[in-house]
């Protein structure tokens, strides 16, 4: 599936690619990087790097999907930088559907979060990686449950900074802002209307439409 997405984006003549999904980064990044010449980055390594800079007691928590936790990639990257660090992973599979249902402030979501995070609170972590792109939308709730003593790390933010550096290093960074009434293009493989509604609820730009593509054609 990640390869099909890559093939489609190549038809759009992209100059760089961010695999902005922790699970896809964990499972497909290394393979995809070997297949194209454009710069490609994932979100796992940037998140791991900033967590290593942030922790004071070398106890780092990671919440993510089951696939990301099972891959062990966050722990691998963290141990490359801080071999002495203890990494505690916790899969939180219900967070994604709760966010997509628009239940971020629902009492049910707080109850689910409290049960997921109880184990991490008992481990005395001081840094917690939000290892899924949906989870920063629950940042306020997660922070409230974990307490001020735990620093939350959003890999997406760190990835954006790394992308800027990467574009500058390759001499392909643009110094102009996107022009036109609709300078952004959005493509989805399914559920275009749901994507538009969800995106308009969280993004600072208005998304009039998202184009649905047949990913199987790639």
Where are these regions (language model features)?
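Non-catalytic structural scaffold of enzyme domains
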Residues: 1-218
């Amino acid at each position: 599936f990640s390869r099909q997405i890559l093939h489609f984006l190549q038809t759009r003549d992209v100059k760089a690619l961010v695999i902005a999904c922790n699970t896809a980064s964990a499972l497909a990044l290394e393979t995809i990087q070997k297949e194209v010449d454009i710069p490609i980055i994932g979100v796992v390594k940037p998140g791991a790097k900033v967590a290593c800079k942030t922790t004071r007691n070398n106890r780092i928590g990671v919440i993510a999907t089951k696939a990301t936790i099972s891959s062990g990639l966050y722990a691998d990257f963290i141990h490359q930088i801080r071999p002495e660090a203890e990494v505690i992973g916790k899969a939180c599979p219900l967070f994604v559907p709760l966010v997509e249902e628009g239940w971020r402030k629902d009492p049910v979501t707080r109850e689910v979060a409290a049960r997921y995070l109880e184990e991490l609170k008992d481990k005395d972590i001081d840094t917690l990686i939000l290892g899924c792109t949906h989870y920063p939308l629950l940042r306020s709730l997660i922070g409230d449950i974990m307490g001020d003593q735990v620093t939350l790390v959003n890999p997406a933010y760190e990835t954006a900074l790394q992308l800027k550096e990467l574009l500058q290093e390759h001499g392909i960074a643009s110094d102009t802002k996107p022009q036109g009434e609709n300078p952004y293009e959005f493509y989805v493989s399914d559920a275009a209307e749901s994507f538009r509604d969800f995106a308009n609820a969280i993004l600072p730009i208005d998304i009039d439409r998202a184009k649905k593509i047949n990913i199987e054609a790639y």
